[in-house]
């Protein structure tokens, strides 16, 4: 099968299976299928059996499975979940960290939402904002188009991303097994800025976490080039 060949022929360390944790189930109206017509758990149950079979009989030791998005009914079957499709608008739709508040100690996520795809838009503020939010909510920083990121216009943004990824490496004892408690807005010198696609927010963002041993940790990110 495909999972076997990817591991044995190519030697991958992880396998990404698109859509499973993202796509909503479609109703089935076939009366001969043995489930309630137009309902039932066949979609969810079928995927769980499929992924369970892969994990039990095909996935090699120290390999991981990932999928798109973070449907609750599959989080125990995947080692990481890519979160990028959350809708957002400046005025009408604000992303709130409900999922990490509930599942941060039981699910590993990657990314936050789609990042800019053009070099001249990398420095408008939303790129840094998305990376900062990913870090604060415990998500692995990533899902970034390398072409605009490595352009001359994005040198400072690339440096900002490298700083956050290096910093996150020191937080493994917090974000893996720890619990996201809340977002914070630090008081004092903390100017409000307009983030394209997200609206107004503070330049310095923060979050409170609780480590597995019960200790509190505060993560603070300054998105500005200036000190605050």
Segments (PLM) and residue ranges:
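Active-site neighborhood of glycoside hydrolase catalytic domains
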Residues: 2-77
């Amino acid at each position: 099968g495909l999972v076997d060949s990817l591991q044995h022929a190519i030697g991958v360390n992880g396998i990404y299976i698109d859509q499973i944790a993202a796509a909503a189930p479609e109703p089935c109206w076939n009366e001969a299928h043995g489930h309630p017509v137009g309902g039932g758990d066949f979609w969810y149950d079928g995927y769980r059996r499929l992924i369970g079979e892969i994990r039990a009989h095909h996935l090699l030791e120290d390999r991981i499975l990932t999928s798109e998005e973070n449907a609750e009914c599959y989080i125990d079957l995947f080692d990481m979940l890519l979160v990028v499709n959350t809708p957002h608008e400046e005025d009408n739709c604000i992303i709130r960290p409900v999922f990490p508040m509930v599942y941060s100690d039981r699910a590993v996520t990657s990314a936050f939402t789609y990042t800019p795809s053009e070099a001249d838009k990398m420095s408008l503020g939303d790129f840094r904002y998305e990376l900062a939010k990913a870090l604060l909510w415990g998500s692995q920083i990533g899902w970034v188009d390398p072409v605009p990121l490595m352009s001359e216009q994005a040198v400072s943004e690339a440096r900002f991303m490298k700083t956050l990824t290096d910093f996150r490496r020191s937080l493994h004892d917090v974000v893996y097994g720890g619990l996201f408690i809340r977002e914070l807005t630090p008081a004092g010198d903390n100017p409000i800025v307009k983030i394209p696609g997200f609206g107004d927010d503070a330049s310095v963002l923060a979050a409170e976490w609780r480590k597995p041993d019960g200790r509190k940790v505060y993560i603070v990110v300054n998105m500005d080039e200036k000190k605050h």
